[in-house]
Amino acid sequence: MNSTPKQIILIRHGEKPGDPALDSEADGITLSTKGFERAGALAPFLWASFGDPDFLFATQASKHSCRPIQTITPLATALGRNINCDYADEAYAALAARIFGDVQYAGKLVLICWHHGKIPELTNALGGAPPSLKWPPAAFDRVWQLPYPDTAGARTGALPVRNLPRMLLYGDSAA
C-alpha cells in the first residue's frame, strides 16, 4: 500500500533570542518574545492556507534548543494533537523513512518544524527539490510545501517544493 502523504509542510522554528535587553528569554534555548508571537499566529495561518495538519513533528529537544517544539505547541493544543519529537536534528532521514514507511500517513497533511540548517537535507530526504541549498539564517517567515501526487509513480525525479511567505507578523516578507 502507498503510504505517501497528501502534502508535507516544512517550517523553521520561531525567532530565537538575540539581545538580552530586547528579549524576554535570553537563554538561547527557548523562543524569543517575537518567536512566541509567531507560534501563536501559526494555527490560523495553517488552517486558512492548508487545513488542519493530521500529524505534527518537531526536532527533539536538546541542551541547545527546544524552539521547534515551542513553535508548534499552540497549534498542537488547538488541534488536540500530540507532537512527535522523537527525532534529533540530524535524524531527518529516519523521519522521512518513518513517514513513507507507515500507512497511517497516507493521504494526510504532515507538518514538520525543524532547525533551518537541516531543512534542505530534510527536504531532499522527503523526495523534494529544495528551493535553495540553504535556508536563509534570518528567515523565520517561510513555508516549504511539498504537495505529493495522488497516485504512486506519478512523479519522476525530485518533487518541486513551493517556497511560500507566511506573513504572520509585521515585517514578514510578502513574496
State what each model feature region is.
Residues N2-G107, K118-A175:
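Active-site-proximal alpha-helix that buttresses catalytic centers in soluble enzyme cores
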Residues V110:
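Mobile, glycine-rich extracellular loop/lid and propeptide segments
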Residues C113-H115:
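Short beta-strand segments
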